[in-house]
């Protein structure tokens, strides 16, 4: 778990997200409070629950990106879900408890990957031994006993060095590999999740016991054998316990479009289902125990971050109990052309840097001038204002349009250095931007 201070967390987030300082401060404090809680004694630690966050702001201003980057900084299990995908218990659709099951699956994969990486060196040695067994089969007498072990040992040493150096990578061998277990998804009726989990485990166990002889190059075989040997070195039950603990103490759930499950205006039949989803979410956010195929997971200390545009509904349209479970509210501001200029140039791996790097692979040097950046940002702001405001996502559309000719004709372009200035941008965008009907459909 990260032990960074709030200011350090905000500084890290600044590398990827422009503006929205209030939201960054809120999530930085929430993450630091997790570290503070873990320093306390066990009894007091159980009493301190996370302060869930409600982000309010239009689309494309950085709500999801803030939560996603926060989870990466914390090295925590993270899942993003859309509130509209869930239905009240008894209706057709996904139940909210599947959020925790999916989060636990993510944690198991994450912990498993970390454990395998730690065992990779040992697994590599074992994989090399298996390949040597194929290359140097020990001689056996008529009764099946191994003989000439000294000669076999000498032969293994002879092959070991070129194997380590990769000199045998192109040589083909036949190898016995375990078949990858098939991941079978079974839709379960309400209340029968435990039986579904047992059926899934049974089918996966059956397929995991199968082996198949394959012919391949030693280089490819070595990679597969390293993964197989590393998997044998880790303890699945121990991994599950570590993953469940990670979910319970460090898990982050991001619920998007929470404003779409608000009841607003006059009541209708759909409002019943919307309010039902809120009531189903309530136990998860308050703290309950959810049954997963990996074990029981308590949600008391999982951090929930909800977000929504709240253009039609208001946060007060949420049921009072759910409002009370999101005590920290931050409003994210709409982005201006000045913000777009910064987004195009300042973040790590900014959009302009990405396009420069892509074209560099074709031997073309792209240079964005300051007035060119200003024109692109202005165009994005204008289209957002005239049509639908989709925030920073508009920059992807605008830039793709600006770069279209270069991307398509990259192999034919003789001029290997291209400057994108305001004149170039206007030439490629002016017709579309000035024609509102065209910009509505194309940009």
Curated annotation (Swiss-Prot):
InterPro entries: AAA+_ATPase (IPR003593), ATP-dep_Clp_protease_ClpX (IPR050052), ATPase_AAA_core (IPR003959), Clp_ATPase_C (IPR019489), HslU (IPR004491), P-loop_NTPase (IPR027417). ATP binds at residues 18, 60-65, 256, 321, 393. It is found in: Cytoplasm. Coiled coil: none annotated. GO terms for cellular component: HslUV protease complex. ATPase subunit of a proteasome-like degradation complex; this subunit has chaperone activity. The binding of ATP and its subsequent hydrolysis by HslU are essential for unfolding of protein substrates subsequently hydrolyzed by HslV. HslU recognizes the N-terminal part of its protein substrates and unfolds these before they are guided to HslV for hydrolysis. Belongs to the ClpX chaperone family. HslU subfamily. This is ATP-dependent protease ATPase subunit HslU.
């Amino acid at each position: 778990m990260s032990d960074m201070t709030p200011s350090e967390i905000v500084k890290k987030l600044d590398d990827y997200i422009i503006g929205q300082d209030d939201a960054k401060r809120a999530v930085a404090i929430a993450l630091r409070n997790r570290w503070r809680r873990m320093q306390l004694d066990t009894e007091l630690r159980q009493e301190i629950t996370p302060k869930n966050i409600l982000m309010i702001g239009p689309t494309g201003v950085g709500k999801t990106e803030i939560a996603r980057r926060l989870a990466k900084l914390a090295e925590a299990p993270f899942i993003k879900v859309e509130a509209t995908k869930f239905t009240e218990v008894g209706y057709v659709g996904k139940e909210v408890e599947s959020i925790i099951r999916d989060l636990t699956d993510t944690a198991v994969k994450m912990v498993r990957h970390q454990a395998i990486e730690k065992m990779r060196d040992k697994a590599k040695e074992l994989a090399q031994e298996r390949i040597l067994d194929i290359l140097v089969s020990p001689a056996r007498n008529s009764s099946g006993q191994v003989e000439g072990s000294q000669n076999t040992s000498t032969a293994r040493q002879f092959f070991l060095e070129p194997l380590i150096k990769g000199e045998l990578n192109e040589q083909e061998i036949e190898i016995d590999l375990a078949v990858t277990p098939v991941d079978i998804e079974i839709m379960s009726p309400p209340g029968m999740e435990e039986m579904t989990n047992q059926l899934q485990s049974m089918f996966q166990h059956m397929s995991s016991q199968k082996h198949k002889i394959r012919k391949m190059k030693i280089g490819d075989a070595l990679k597969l054998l390293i993964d197989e040997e590393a998997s044998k070195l880790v303890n699945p039950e121990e991994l599950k316990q570590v993953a469940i603990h990670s979910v319970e103490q460090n898990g982050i759930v991001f619920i998007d479009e929470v404003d779409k499950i608000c009841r607003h205006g006059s009541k209708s039949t759909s409002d019943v289902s919307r309010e039902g989803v809120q009531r189903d979410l309530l136990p998860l956010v308050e703290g309950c125990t959810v049954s997963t195929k990996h074990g029981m997971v308590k949600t008391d200390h999982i951090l929930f971050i909800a977000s929504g545009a709240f253009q039609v509904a208001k946060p007060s349209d949420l049921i009072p109990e759910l409002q009370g479970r999101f005590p920290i509210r931050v409003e994210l501001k709409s982005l201006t052309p000045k913000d777009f200029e910064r987004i195009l140039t300042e973040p790590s791996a900014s959009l302009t840097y990405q396009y420069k790097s892509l074209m560099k692979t074709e031997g073309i040097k792209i240079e964005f001038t300051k007035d060119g950046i200003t024109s692109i940002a202005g165009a994005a702001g204008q289209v957002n204002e005239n049509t639908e405001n989709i925030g920073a996502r508009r920059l992807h559309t605008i830039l793709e349009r600006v770069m279209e000719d270069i991307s398509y004709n990259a192999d034919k372009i003789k001029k290997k250095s291209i400057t994108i200035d305001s004149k170039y941008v206007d030439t490629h965008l002016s017709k579309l931007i000035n024609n509102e009907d065209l910009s509505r459909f194309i940009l």
